[in-house]
């Protein structure tokens, strides 16, 4: 059983082809700069070698056609024929309240997904382009949608509602939805497998820390709260996003700077966060170098970044009524030891104790808490694509 997983962005398509009998990745890569000058496909060969194939890719259908042709090409192919692809699983960003689990895509489902476009005007239409492209090229292959927001649909209303006039929720669906749900679901399940424990009765805080970041509180395997909101702008300090900010500060800045809604959205989403404070970069590796060189704004940005994560862990420990497992994932969470140690420093009162030697781990599954730590602290690399492929397989087998 071979499943192709697609993640279509506004100008990019990432893909992974899995053989689900072994969960082996047969092929992976991505197209960048769709519709722009200099578009290309970057792929990883089975031996780990990377190749870049340049080609003019005006839109998503041409991109997916290029990917499929590459998958069966004599030189870079992983399969002999496209008939070997049994199904396609799509990362779908915003499923609103309509989707609390992964679904087989049909006209009714896609119409409901299109109705959520207002909530993710950049991402949802791009996801849809991917689905339509596959329908055009492989009309008989079943497609499954896996929603970033679905895992968080178990939050209680008092956690997801905003304290604004209730009719704004009724009219426009303004509430907390949360994102990175497929990642939070994967790592929270995987850490229980890794530790050999039952998710039932466990209180887990999952920290997905990358250029974008979010934290979730998970009780008995279900999400009860998460840091991102109606959009991915709420919560943690991120690479270019502000995270939590007083709404009054937003209107104040709009007046002072003469910004409209688009302008202030651009400021908070693309020019803020670590980049905005440090003036150096949104990349934590570059920020680290600036911190090491003694750059005061970089030092401030890093402290703010770590502090916000720590604050959310404390809040979610309260929401859960304690915590059994704290888990780090995402590009920064998996690879940056100082992020994990700084965040956990001062949490000893909660029973958190890091083993500095164990914490040197990068990008692999590990327990990094000390043997006498009451709370287990773990690193679990996320695998959203495998989760999407697994869901797709489960739906096919229904």
Swiss-Prot record:
Main subcellular location: cytoplasm
Single GO MF descriptor: acetate kinase activity
Pfam families per record: Acetate_kinase (PF00871)
Taxonomic superkingdom: Bacteria
Sites where the protein binds ATP: 14, 208-212, 283-285, 331-335
Reactions catalysed: acetate + ATP = acetyl phosphate + ADP
Keyword rRNA-binding belongs to the record: no
Cofactor note: Mg(2+). Can also accept Mn(2+).
Localization terms from the record: Cytoplasm
Keywords: ATP-binding, Cytoplasm, Kinase, Magnesium, Metal-binding, Nucleotide-binding, Transferase
Annotated binding of substrate, by residue: 91
Cofactor entry: Mg(2+); Mn(2+)
Xref: InterPro entries: Ac/propionate_kinase, Aliphatic_acid_kin_short-chain, Aliphatic_acid_kinase_CS, ATPase_NBD
Site (Transition state stabilizer): 180, 241
One Gene Ontology biological process: acetate metabolic process
One term under GO cellular component: cytoplasm
Annotated active site: 148 (proton donor/acceptor)
Family, per entry: Belongs to the acetokinase family.
Record-linked PANTHER family: ACETATE KINASE (PTHR21060), ACETATE KINASE-RELATED (PTHR21060:SF15)
Function description: Catalyzes the formation of acetyl phosphate from acetate and ATP. Can also catalyze the reverse reaction.
Subunit architecture: Homodimer.
Protein's UniProt name: Acetate kinase
Natural source organism: Phocaeicola vulgatus (strain ATCC 8482 / DSM 1447 / JCM 5826 / CCUG 4940 / NBRC 14291 / NCTC 11154) (Bacteroides vulgatus)
